[in-house]
């Protein structure tokens, strides 16, 4: 298990456009393995390569069934609907905002061996696909919210969500 340091907001690599992966080799496999280990250790639901200082189009997403999906050279090919909800980021610790994303997202990507595939999901996983792919283009979720929640506002938002679900 190899954990990588998570890059924080303000560091240059989070604002750069990542280059596509062209070599599907052992270095890529090590990166993906390390990213999965780092994601699981962090308690997050997604991690993009620039968040560990690597400017390549690679990300990992943990879906709502706790499966980790590896996405190499991902692109969003279809969206449907809209959802608005709370979002945070491992590279922006302690900060949360309300962000609107598509409800359903289909992604075309390659696996660690270069094989193309498509994956479609909704809700939190769809939100995560969008969030992580934006990292590959040098963007952070804070660009989509005009207000970062204070700790008090965050707790109030969570309380209201729980009441709505009850």
Enumerate the predicted regions with their spans.
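Active-site rim/adjacent substrate-binding subdomains
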Residues: 1-130, 135-166
């Amino acid at each position: 298990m190899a954990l990588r340091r998570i890059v924080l907001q303000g560091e240059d690599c989070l604002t750069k456009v990542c280059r596509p992966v062209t070599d599907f080799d052992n270095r890529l496999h090590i990166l993906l393995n390390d990213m999965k280990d780092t994601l699981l250790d962090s308690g997050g639901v997604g991690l993009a390569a620039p968040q560990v200082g690597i400017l390549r189009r690679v990300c990992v997403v943990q879906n709502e069934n706790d499966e980790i999906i590896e996405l190499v050279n991902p692109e969003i090919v279809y969206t449907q609907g809209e959802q608005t909800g709370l979002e945070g980021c491992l590279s922006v610790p302690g900060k949360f905002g309300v962000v609107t994303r598509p409800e359903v997202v289909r992604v075309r990507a390659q696996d660690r061996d270069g094989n193309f595939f498509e994956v479609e999901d909704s809700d939190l996983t769809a939100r995560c696909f969008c969030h992580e792919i934006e990292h590959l283009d040098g963007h952070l979720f804070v660009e989509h919210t005009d207000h970062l929640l204070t700790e008090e506002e965050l707790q109030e938002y969570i309380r209201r969500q729980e009441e709505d679900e009850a």
